[in-house]
Amino acid sequence: MNTDFPKIYSATGMMELIQKIGFLPLLDSGIDGFSAEDIVDEDCRYVTFPEGGWDWPLWKWKGEIVQEMPCMYGKFFNKKAGFISQEWWPDFCNYRRSKFPRPDEDSIEGTILSTLQSTGSLITRELRAACGFTGKGMRSKFDGYLTRLEMATYIVTEDFIYPRDKHNHEYGWGWSLLNTPEDLYGREAFQCNRTPQESYKRIFEHLKEILPDASDKQIIKLIG
């Protein structure tokens, strides 16, 4: 598929692209060529070393991107992670929340959301413990609830936190620092004077413009 996106070599280049096109899944989106992994230069993709260890510049850029743009990051695209610019967030949020109303406070999702709102940002394992998901097999169940809240735009990733070794070097895959978008940017960041269906139509037409070879079915699946 011809997406006509330039090759990206840095976090700065990725930020400029996200600002320009508005939506960008991190990995496979179901639309050929439309992901950060597809767009970055080969040197910025995941690689393992013969002597052990790995490097993945794109993975390391995520925190810099969400902190410096800023933009929204979470599992927004068919339960997979990606970026949405602040320009497009009000329409995306307007549509998604019309499909997924705020959960009842006495539901599990409602408890997770109210816990996060009362404590402020928490890494995933801290939020899981605060909500009582500490038993065997609870991690995957909790992750499922989190994904639903991210798809509904009630929770986003504020940053990524990495453990440090004895030399104070970051290592590992890192942990998502979760927060609500309202706490991060205020309710004014959500102001949208369109109906949910008008927002949907605006997003659909925009994605058709930047992805001319994608089918309607592919774009509908991406929007959710």
How would you label these PLM feature ranges?
Residues 1-224:
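Long, low-complexity intrinsically disordered regions
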